A protein has these predicted regions:
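Short amphipathic alpha-helix segments
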Residues: 23-31
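Short, low-order "capping/linker" segments at domain edges
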Residues: 92-100
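Preference for well-ordered, secondary-structure-rich cores of eukaryotic proteins
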Residues: 11-13, 85, 95
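Absolute protein N-terminus
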Residues: 1-2, 100
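Short coil/turn motifs at secondary-structure junctions
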Residues: 13-15, 58-60, 100
Length: 100
């Protein structure tokens, strides 16, 4: 089975950057303690305020079960990020499979 790299990319309103980063760190810390997913948030080196949420998942089953595992805290933080910080609420998703 191949691992899966799942990414969610978006741009954040510059004036809300600090508040976004605090919320993203809260989400990262929560995911670290309450999920088995390998999860991180990164910023594009060449484009300030362009962020990517990165999940490295062990297999298709873990990928397919991601939404089912969202509890109220994850849902609330994710909704806040998308509604308050993301420019025009626009996100770009990409899914990549490890070659084997």
């Amino acid at each position: 089975m191949s691992r899966i790299l799942f990414q969610i990319n978006y741009d954040v309103h510059p004036e809300k950057r600090d508040e976004y980063i605090a919320t993203a760190k809260e989400l990262q810390a929560y995911m670290s303690g309450h999920s088995n997913h390998n999860y991180m948030v990164v910023e594009d080196k060449n484009k300030k305020n362009s962020f990517t949420e990165v999940y490295i998942l062990k297999d298709e089953a873990e990928f397919e079960g991601m939404e089912d595992e969202m509890d109220d805290t994850v849902y609330g933080l994710t909704t806040r990020i998308l509604s308050e910080f993301v420019v025009d609420g626009k996100t770009r998703y990409s899914t990549h499979y490890e070659i084997s």
